[in-house]
Amino acid sequence: MGRLLDTIDSPTDLKKVPVEQLPALCQEIREQIIQTCARNGGHLGSSLGAVEINVALHHVFSSPQDKLVWDVGHQAYAHKLLTGRREAFRTIRTEGGLAGFPERHESAHDAFGVGHASTAISAALGMIEAKRVTGEPGKVVAVVGDGAMTGGVAFEGLNQAGYLGRNLLVVLNDNEMSISPNVGALSEWFSKKFASRTYNRWRRQVKEFLESVPKGPEAIEIIRHGINATKALVTPGILFEGLGFHYVGPVDGHDVKGLVETFQKLAIFDGPVLLHAITTKGKGYHPAESDKATRGHGLSFFDVATGKPVKKSPGAKAYTDLFAEALCEEMEHDPRVVAITAAMLEGTGLIKAKQRFPDRTYDVGIAEQHAVTFAAGLACEGIRPVVAIYSTFLQRAYDQIIHDVALQKLPVTFALDRGGLVGADGKTHQGAFDLAYLRCVPGLVVMAPSDENELRHMLHTSLQHDGPAALRYPRGAGEGVALEPARVLEIGKGRLARNVPGKPDVCVVAAGTTLKAALAAAEALAAEGVAATVVDPRFVKPLDEELICAEAGRAKRVVTVEEGCLAGGFGTACLEAFERRGLLEAGLGVRRLGIPDEFITHAEQAKQRAWVGIDADAIAAACRALVGDRKARGVA
């Protein structure tokens, strides 16, 4: 007998499956997710924990007319399987395959593109309001994880949704990793009662009665508070009720039959409602359920039988691990140093700092804006905070970087993990913009280490600097260099990484870890008789204009390389320096290599670097073209 899952090519097919068979379908979906994530990596735990919610939603609502908006998208693997992408699911997070997150261009069932947290409620409210304006039929549901509820924008959306009173359904998928629910016999009893027609009919009848009494609105408000008072005492819903939502729950988020029944009732409810569903992250897969730290949050390839990562050949440590070790050394030597992250203790490596220095390591939740201003407050009182956040997520705190830190010249260090191209996580997670959006901030020192030692030196330098500083480093392994004791670098001074005797044909200025590819390109060019010098600028701001302009002027041709956006980035900084020094008027030939004006999709990092033209082959080709073009025109 074949799988139920193989009969489902759309939500319409799912609706034909009897409710009694849905638990078996959920098990098949779990098995498919586990097998695929073992091969491709991905957000296993969140998706396993939300299978029943996915199935019940699609069984009751009618996507794409009804809009299902997934916060972050970690929970949406089952959604992809149920919406015509079953066969393509094996390609998820691979080159040319499905994205790891919902994307509007991928399917009409992906109502909103996501990847960053806490946005679903605001987006869903916009959709339901658009339906009101246009008269288009359909329901809108936002599915939000409890972790996303630590983000302020989620409550901004709740606040307006409650005020407007639209028929918005918010499903809070609480996997007990952030929120501690108030559960028990009374809570369970109230959950059933508050979702029932009887309870809501009673509320409506009381209201209708009071409206016939003079000064009814005031009386209604008094009685409404009385009705809700007992409920608020025994459920965690008081906050949501206070924001204008009708609260239902907690309910068992793995009881798919019960969820179908509840969604059927809530689909006809008038007004904003929040359903609180308790789930288990990693549900149905013991290795994920038993991982108390992350429960299979974001995994690379793993062995299905054990849940353990598939070991690749031994190599250099990841930059993330090296940063964490260097930070712990700094914290050990200087009690003023503290570490801050936004719900990414594991991802940024700060779990090591938390274990060694629990009272000086802060996880503020998905609250990047708060993290930066919290750091600013600490810095005001003599503390040396290090804010470790993925490059893509620090974008959310840009105003705080400028207004709360840089404007006041506070000594806050920003450690930007995942700077540059990130691989399988794709468009929403690329760290492409940091060099551009940071280098324009007055007084902010911006550093890009080319190897592990440079990372250690730059962290140490930032903590000795009396002002704001940022260092960005990539995802993945380091270069494998022997580690040196950390030392203070002279701010604004780069180094000549490769010199040649006499007059060079071309100079390559390579920011950060693009230095390795630049050196490889220079060696390949040397074999062809093309002499190339290579500069490691170290600092994107302040730029070492003396060194860079001197080497560019010596060669008369220069290629800049960065793993960041070309618009406003490191290459632009060099162009500005060349302009100031009169090198452009003197005929300097310039080529800039970096990420073009587009969002780079998911693939292996090496392939992405080849796509955008910053690998060794592309750098060598750019140098050849520049040298050949100049010689063809008779320019020395």
Curated annotation (Swiss-Prot):
In short, the EC number is: 2.2.1.7
Q: Which GO terms describe its cellular component?
A: cytosol
Q: Keywords for this entry? A: Isoprene biosynthesis, Magnesium, Metal-binding, Thiamine biosynthesis, Thiamine pyrophosphate, Transferase
GO BP annotations of the record are: 1-deoxy-D-xylulose 5-phosphate biosynthetic process; isopentenyl diphosphate biosynthetic process, methylerythritol 4-phosphate pathway; terpenoid biosynthetic process; thiamine biosynthetic process
Which residues does the record give as Mg(2+) binding sites?
Answer: D146, N175
Which reaction equation describes what this protein catalyses? D-glyceraldehyde 3-phosphate + pyruvate + H(+) = 1-deoxy-D-xylulose 5-phosphate + CO2
The pathway entry for this protein reads as: Metabolic intermediate biosynthesis; 1-deoxy-D-xylulose 5-phosphate biosynthesis; 1-deoxy-D-xylulose 5-phosphate from D-glyceraldehyde 3-phosphate and pyruvate: step 1/1
Recorded hits in SUPFAM superfamilies, A to Z, give: Thiamin diphosphate-binding fold (THDP-binding), TK C-terminal domain-like
Q: Which residues bind thiamine diphosphate?
A: H74, G115, H116, A117, G147, A148, N175, Y285, E368
Q: What's this protein's function?
A: Catalyzes the acyloin condensation reaction between C atoms 2 and 3 of pyruvate and glyceraldehyde 3-phosphate to yield 1-deoxy-D-xylulose-5-phosphate (DXP).
Which named protein is this?
A: 1-deoxy-D-xylulose-5-phosphate synthase
Q: Which organism is it from?
A: Anaeromyxobacter dehalogenans (strain 2CP-1 / ATCC BAA-258)
Gene assigned in the entry: dxs
